[in-house]
Design a protein with these regions (language model features):
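Short linear regulatory motifs enriched in tryptophan with gly/pro/ser
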Residues: 1-202
């Protein structure tokens, strides 16, 4: 459906995404259209951080929870989950300084702090979303959460550790915890680029 004549282009949100509990922090800075649904934002966060989207996830803002609702949630006594496909980013993060939590993998419980740093006018020559900065590679999937990740780093950094060789084989020779490239992240974000500083057609 074509955008209505005179439709206002979505604002661009500058978000800082920090993997909580990491030191030094693993983080990304992203420019994303404010009219993304939270389901679309999930895809952006997976690509930007370097996750593989192998597990469940959820957004939380205050007492509200957003994700993929299941009839089993109520039976298990879990808080009600709003459908992330119908909620836009601008409706949950509206003011500069607003925060949310994005949790990925309920077993390892990777919690990401989302901070709205700026609200910007869109650049008509830029395809969004865009990564503008960051630091360090995200942990390997299924490594046991923050505690397991740092135990893994200790073992990989100590050739005398009794599990050094086994864990090195598990993560693979190409895993570098210090690696980060804006260009690489932006290549991963390419499939999510639907906005070029113009109004959404949705």
């Amino acid at each position: 459906m074509p955008a209505k004549k005179g439709a206002v282009p979505p604002e661009i949100y500058q978000l800082k995404v920090t993997l909580l509990g990491t030191s030094p922090p693993i983080w990304r800075r992203l420019l994303v259209p404010s009219d993304l649904t939270l389901a679309q934002l999930h895809d952006v966060l997976q690509a930007a951080m370097g996750w593989q989207d192998c597990h469940m996830h959820e957004f939380s803002v205050g007492r509200r929870h957003f994700g993929r609702p299941s009839p089993d949630d109520r039976l298990m006594g879990m808080p009600p989950v709003e459908n992330e496909r119908t909620v836009r980013l601008s409706s949950v993060l509206g003011r500069v300084g607003a925060k949310a939590i994005y949790t990925y993998d309920f077993g390892d419980s990777w919690e990401h702090g989302l901070l709205l740093e700026k609200r910007l006018a869109p650049d008509p020559n830029t395809a969004y979303p865009v990564c503008t900065g960051g630091q360090l590679a995200c942990p390997p999937e299924d490594c046991g959460g923050i505690g397991g990740f740092y135990d893994l780093m200790d073992a990989l950094g100590d050739p005398a550790h009794d599990q050094h060789d086994e864990l090195l084989d598990w993560v693979g020779d190409d895993y570098d915890p210090d690696a980060f490239s804006v260009d690489d992240v932006n290549r991963m974000l390419t499939p999510a680029r639907r906005h070029r500083g113009k109004a959404s057609k949705n």
